[in-house]
């Protein structure tokens, strides 16, 4: 089920259940997960994209294994807030994924999440090679943490 607002998403979630955050890219999907109290987002892994069926199988395996109740998908809006082709692609991915699972799905504005993740990794003195390996799932954690903070204040 796709929830257009965070309020609708919150109403669809069972209490004390973990969430997943996704940073959807052309080549990779960054994945982060929350604790059951929905306080902290933790980077989990980066999935190399192949085709939708394989990507969805990998994501749904994580959802099942970690008992995820909701998915927060980063929505790559333009800096002026408008939606371009990447937003349309992300919404299409969500529609296709929602056909395969009953898990609630919502969107979170991901503008500058990768920039914030890159900055944090630079401050942690991470090597360039290591940054390229973890940037997507660290960005997913930034996306998920933003949504968790909003959910906490509803």
Swiss-Prot record:
Record has Calcium as a keyword: no
Primary location group: cytoplasm
Keyword Glycosyltransferase belongs to the record: no
GO biological process: rRNA 5'-end processing
EC number: 3.1.-.-
Subcellular location(s) per record: Cytoplasm
Domain of life: Bacteria
Task of the protein: Could be a nuclease involved in processing of the 5'-end of pre-16S rRNA.
Similarity section: Belongs to the YqgF nuclease family.
Protein name according to UniProt: Putative pre-16S rRNA nuclease
Organism in which the protein naturally occurs: Ruegeria pomeroyi (strain ATCC 700808 / DSM 15171 / DSS-3) (Silicibacter pomeroyi)
